[in-house]
């Protein structure tokens, strides 16, 4: 996996815009201000995760990719492009921003070979039935509420559904690695600023 390709794909699908979110979990106590986002994962002037993702995905050929926190859908477009044979699933409480942005993503070349399955899911809830009915997860990306309680709850629910050799990523929360290390004591845990990952 090439970091420059990750940066280029994200830039293709996600120009920066300021956008508020519409729906929050009633248990989410985080700040609800608008986000100035396009794609914020890969580019060095944003979160700069491209090199970490390139290393994490180097030997991974996922058949099941799940991302929590869809927002405008740029990451889903990225995963669908990178893994055209994989089932890509997006979890969120609100898909309105994604649906509004989907034509823009398609105009930019997204979803020509793969389209994600969308499912309403609350990171603070306890519903795992939908995920348990899917094949095991090879790549899980938690880009959800960015709060310790939500991350710990999601790890508790999703962890048992991960395939051996899979990668579990927590974005934009510096304490994510400690949560992952506690949940997966045998895993190699990577700490990279705001991104943490467990290679199972």
Model features per residue range: what roles?
Residues 1-200:
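A short alpha-helical cap/connector motif
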């Amino acid at each position: 996996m090439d970091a420059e390709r990750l940066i280029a794909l994200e830039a293709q699908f996600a120009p920066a815009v300021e956008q508020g979110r519409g729906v929050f979990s009633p248990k989410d106590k985080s700040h609800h201000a608008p986000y100035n986002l396009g794609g914020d994962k890969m580019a060095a002037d944003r979160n700069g995760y491209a090199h970490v993702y390139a290393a994490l995905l180097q030997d991974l050929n996922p058949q099941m990719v799940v991302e929590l926190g869809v927002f405008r859908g740029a990451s889903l477009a990225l995963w669908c492009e990178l893994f055209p044979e994989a089932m890509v699933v997006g979890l969120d409480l609100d898909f309105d921003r994604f649906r509004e942005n989907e034509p823009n993503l398609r105009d930019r070349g997204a979803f020509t070979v793969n389209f994600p399955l969308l499912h309403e899911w609350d990171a603070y809830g306890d519903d795992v039935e939908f995920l348990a009915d899917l094949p095991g997860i090879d790549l899980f990306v938690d880009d959800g509420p960015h709060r310790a309680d939500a991350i710990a709850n999601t790890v508790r629910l999703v962890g048992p559904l991960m395939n051996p050799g899979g990668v579990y990523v927590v974005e934009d929360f510096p304490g994510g690695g400690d949560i992952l290390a506690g949940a997966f004591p045998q895993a190699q845990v990577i700490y990279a600023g705001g991104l943490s990952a467990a290679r199972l």
